[in-house]
Amino acid sequence: MRVYLVGGAVRDRLLNFPVKERDWVVVGGTSEALLSLGYQQVGKDFPVFLHPQTHEEYALARTERKSGLGYTGFTCYAAPDVTLEDDLQRRDLTVNAIAQTPTGELVDPYHGVDDLNNRILRHVSDAFSEDPLRVLRVARFAARFAHLGFTIASETQALMSNMAINGELSVLTPERVWKETEKALASPSPQVFFQVLRDCGALAVLFPEIDNLFGVPAPEKWHPEIDTGIHTLMVLKVATELTDEVDSRFAALCHDLGKGLTPPEQWPHHYGHGPAGVKLVDQLCQRLRVPNSARDLAKLAAQYHDLVHTVTQLRPKTLLKLFDAVDAWRKPQRIEQLIIISEADARGRTGFENTPYPQGDCLRQAFKVASQVQVKNIVDSGLRGADIGHELRRQRQHALAQWKQQDDTAQDNTVT
């Protein structure tokens, strides 16, 4: 038996990335031989084993033949006569089809090292088109490695487009689509993921709510980039610079979905797009089975991002309504999340990328002031039942009114 390190571990080492997990392929071996050495079989559809000490995955070299629909319709053949080259040929991209011997020598029959050096994502063979999940995987790798200058080979792009046109993506389950999307949102350049999907036609199939934003104009005075789809990806890019949270990045992506519903005769204005967008966020999240935390934040972002932009003009009563609506008293982190999303919205415009966002500090301070009103003091005063809530709101509103008055006075004193 011969053992080789394969896949992402080899690729990431060559890119000087930290290797998080290692996968191995066993050539010339059998299930019986590995079991006799103490390996534990875990693969149901193909022979994958866990090493008895390291618990790393070891898979018998195998080939795959298309036998049905989708990414699960494959017949697997694993036997001692399957070569390393055979096994590597079934992989998606040449940069993922490089093997390494235990002594560190590279086995690279499909020129993955050249593609790594040239920053190219290229499919290994035409069998790529047999697995629709690979469209999402390539888009995700493009997002992960965009900051290094990686691009997709034109012939790979053409294959992806054909797969989208031919309806291949319709067999993807919601769970797999979201899993790849979630990984892409955690990458350094998630906006690239969605741009790649749009370029090959997959965005219209998998994320029609987002695809519908492209070609929808906004007022040039406020949006020099004009196109709402372009603005959306710009917002996602800024949000990625501001936070590592997948939920916040997803919410930034969804904040303007309602603009896709605006009748063309009303363009470039989008009155009421916030509430309209909430329904589309729900629709998208139900279809892809997005986790509740991401869904709930995205709905709040769609509903309230425009209100956050006007926070310096809001009355104390309106501020309290906002805090109540986003459940900030129980989930105070939502204030910071909404600030980040709203700042990304403001800066995700051509020419506004480095513009300060003072509304963030204003909302942050307002919530701090309102939060300093203690329920315990009200209870200790002898009030009971609903009177406690009424008094709590009154005191919070009073505290905000005093703060706004002091803030206005301070600003007046700075005027010369």
Curated annotation (Swiss-Prot):
SMART domains, A to Z: HDc
Reactions it catalyzes: a tRNA precursor + 2 CTP + ATP = a tRNA with a 3' CCA end + 3 diphosphate; a tRNA with a 3' CCA end + 2 CTP + ATP = a tRNA with a 3' CCACCA end + 3 diphosphate
Binding residues for CTP: G8, R11, R91, R137, R140
Keyword terms: ATP-binding, Hydrolase, Magnesium, Metal-binding, Multifunctional enzyme, Nickel, Nucleotide-binding, Nucleotidyltransferase, RNA repair, RNA-binding, Transferase, tRNA processing
Cofactor comment: Magnesium is required for nucleotidyltransferase activity.
SUPFAM superfamilies according to UniProt: Nucleotidyltransferase, Poly A polymerase C-terminal region-like
GO MF annotations in UniProt: ATP binding; CCA tRNA nucleotidyltransferase activity; cyclic-nucleotide phosphodiesterase activity; magnesium ion binding; phosphatase activity; tRNA binding
Cofactors that this protein relies on: Mg(2+); Ni(2+)
One protein family per Pfam: HD
Binding site for ATP: G8, R11, R91, R137, R140
GO BP, one annotated term: tRNA 3'-terminal CCA addition
EC identifiers of the protein: 2.7.7.72, 3.1.3.-, 3.1.4.-
Disulfide bonds: none
Domain HD, chain residue ranges per copy: 228-329
Protein residues bound to Mg(2+): E21, D23
Alphabetical list of HAMAP family matching this protein: CCA_bact_type1, CCA_bact_type2
Note on domains (UniProt): Comprises two domains: an N-terminal domain containing the nucleotidyltransferase activity and a C-terminal HD domain associated with both phosphodiesterase and phosphatase activities.
Other notes: A single active site specifically recognizes both ATP and CTP and is responsible for their addition.
Quaternary assembly: Monomer. Can also form homodimers and oligomers.
Family: Belongs to the tRNA nucleotidyltransferase/poly(A) polymerase family. Bacterial CCA-adding enzyme type 1 subfamily.
Function per UniProt: Catalyzes the addition and repair of the essential 3'-terminal CCA sequence in tRNAs without using a nucleic acid template. Adds these three nucleotides in the order of C, C, and A to the tRNA nucleotide-73, using CTP and ATP as substrates and producing inorganic pyrophosphate. tRNA 3'-terminal CCA addition is required both for tRNA processing and repair. Also involved in tRNA surveillance by mediating tandem CCA addition to generate a CCACCA at the 3' terminus of unstable tRNAs. While stable tRNAs receive only 3'-terminal CCA, unstable tRNAs are marked with CCACCA and rapidly degraded.
Name of the protein described by the UniProt record: Multifunctional CCA protein
Native organism: Photorhabdus laumondii subsp. laumondii (strain DSM 15139 / CIP 105565 / TT01)
